[in-house]
Amino acid sequence: MLFRSLIADIAGLPKANLHYYFPTKEDLYRRVVQTIFEIWLHAAEAMDDAPGPVEGIGRYIDAKMEISRLHPNGSKVWAYEVMHGAPVIQDYLETTLRDWTAGRVHLIQRWIDEGKMSRINPEHLLYMLWATTQHYADFGHQIATLNGGPLSDAEWQAAKTSVKTMILRGIGALT
């Protein structure tokens, strides 16, 4: 019970409230995993009204990398869950994530059909975007070790610019 007591203390809630809203550890864990996914979904809204991939994917990369910077533990929890076969959130992957992904694929395919980017597989672009942006959270310790310390604000900005340039050029959206 130390785990739940610690969470209640960090959240500034009485332990009884935590038990009321999350009767089991699985309920609490599921909510944590869903919350990081909801944060990522919100980040993807940057693509919705974009005229093309430079703006849409560029803003998405900025948002996802900022989330990796500000909420690295959320990404690590998500990665842990998925790497273990998603025992708690498999239904979420099969519904919410699948539907969301289909919508992003449709948008990216539209940009491809409009000649705004190379003919690539939209799903694999999404996988690459997720892997690249979440790497900065999931492997933050490795990056900090190789960098001689955590990335500074300027280094984060440079990383975002580099990632955007490499991906957008790689998909033929930048020349």
Identify the meaning behind each predicted range.
Residues 3-27, 31:
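Helix-turn-helix
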Residues 15-18, 36-40, 44-52, 73-77, ...:
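Anionic, Ser/Thr-rich low-complexity intrinsically disordered regions
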Residues 21-45, 94:
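An amphipathic alpha-helix adjacent to DNA-recognition modules
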Residues 45-74, 114, 122-129, 157-160:
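Hydrophobic alpha-helical connector segments
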Residues 61-64, 78-81, 129, 133, ...:
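Short alpha-helical scaffolding segments that buttress acidic/His motifs in well-ordered protein cores
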Residues 66, 70, 98, 102-114, ...:
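C-terminal peripheral helix-coil segments that are non-catalytic and often amphipathic
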Residues 69-91, 139-146:
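Amphipathic alpha-helical segments used for helix-helix packing
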